[in-house]
Amino acid sequence: GGMLAEQMLVFFVLLFCFVVVGEKIAQYFSPGILNTKNTVKCMLLPVSPSEYLSPSELQQKMDRVVEKVRKSPTVIAFGKSKWLVPYTRPEEMYLSDSIQIGTRKMHVFLKFADKYMNQVFQLQMEEGEWLTDELLEDGSCPAVITSQLMQELGWSRGIGKRIYYKGTVFTVVGIVTGIKQEPLKASRPTMIVPNRIQPDQWFEYMVRVKEGETDNFRNLMNKEFNLMMGKEPVRLSFGNIEKWKLNDMRDVFITLLGIGIPTIFLFLFAFIGT
């Protein structure tokens, strides 16, 4: 009786491990995983406060570097965004805020992006088109929302719907399948709006390069950056988003393996002992 109870306990622990691993794998393949292969994050890092240029002026210089490098044959797409780049921070550290639809208010994740960012991450459009930084003909701002926000609102069609945020009117121009902020978590209700909504704050620069061209891109970017910045106390750093994603996933699965492997051995020994 005692041996059977031990076997049953080990069996249920092992079953729990398999269920958790299965859920994590299912969450990874759920809608909204961004394509980060062959992408590079370019980070502008002030070494010390500039005596001559403000942060916004430094950013304008960086914009000119990006505009020039964007024309390189090594580059597929080079964009600028805020809070859109995934896997760089825990989900709770991404920006979320309240939006209004009619009389209803709801809390959603907010992203800011330019017209290139959907090409950088190869976002999957379900309906409509990606946004630009230009106002629409009626004077409203374009917005793209995730299908999860559509579901939350109970909309069967989202294109043309109005959303209000901090006194600005947005018109939905596109729907994406999702935007996952962590690889092993589901996509959340999210709204993406143009960079112009918050023009004077920090931005994240992301590029998609052709296969095998990462080193050539970095060399070119460093060259143009140094030419533009001169002796300004600022440096350029590169981040590998794909590696960060894999590290995030590895940490989760190592924890699960730490539980699962001893449980498997206990399971085997429990049956060998019968």
Predicted regions and their residues:
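A structural signal for well-ordered alpha-helical scaffolds and beta->alpha junctions
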Residues: C17, V21, L58-D63, L110-D114, ...
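Short, contiguous acidic/charged loop-to-helix segments that flank catalytic cores in large enzymes
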Residues: I101-M106, D133-E137, I192-I197, M206-G212, ...
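Hydrophobic alpha-helical transmembrane segments of multi-pass inner-membrane transport and secretion
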Residues: G1-K24, D251-T274
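Hydrophobic secondary-structure segments that place a key small or acidic residue at a functional site
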Residues: R104-P189
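Membrane-proximal extracellular/periplasmic loop immediately following the first transmembrane helix
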Residues: V21-R104
